[in-house]
Amino acid sequence: MASLGSGRLRVFHSWPGPMIRVDAIWLATEPMDMRAGTETALARVVAVFGAAKPHCAYLFANRRANRMKVLVHDGVGIWLAARRLNQGKFYWPGIHRGMEVELDPEQLQALVLGLPWQRVGAGGAITLL
């Protein structure tokens, strides 16, 4: 919000909180074609997880694990975001671990940065060597 007073622009910061609430983060182990748009990604979420539940984020990577898409159902609609690593790749679990894995927010932060998220626990504590 901005106000124009005395010929100067004043900016008022009033941020109510996060725009998109995410209560659970799910990672699919099978790769997805990164050309997929919102409808295709949503169909994939339903196929892998059974449903797109409100306030849940669903993560998919391509075969090379250097690109990731995140689909979030915010309770009203669907958001689809993409991330690409220019160097290296995301630490993605193999298919042998199952169809999906639940992550906590600290693990998601590590994953998005390309770090080994499996070693990060609650509060950013390293739990595995």
Residue ranges and their predicted role:
Residues 1-129:
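Polybasic/polar functional segments that serve as interface/processing modules
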